[in-house]
Amino acid sequence: MLAETSLDPQEALVCTMVLVAAAGEGITDSEIGVMSGLVQTVPVFRGFSADRLAVATDRAVELLREADGLAHAGRLIRDSLPPRLRETAYALACEVAAADFFEDRASVSILELVRDELALDPLVAAAIERGARARYQVV
């Protein structure tokens, strides 16, 4: 249906989170909560409304339904983000994966795809992953 050709940077960040959340058996309540909380609190989303979040999420889901949706989404994310926001995108994706304690193997696989598509330094990616794990530890 959609043949998305571009996203604005905030939409690309949302799309990155949705990719990870949708990787498993569906988007969990904890993943929705994390995505919503991040959009409300992370400075890169300043001025990004709940309505825009809903629209961007729907666009990302539709994109994933395309025949080559995952690869297309990866390219769109990469092409829509300035280099300075690529680590931010990966950090947001890790936060979503951490919402389920990195237990969903499909989400972890998508993180690998995102990391590769964004050409992140492996040490930087590992530090971002470890930071997300540390924030989501439970007693």
Residue ranges and their predicted role:
Residues M1-V139:
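Small-residue-enriched hydrophobic alpha-helices in membranes
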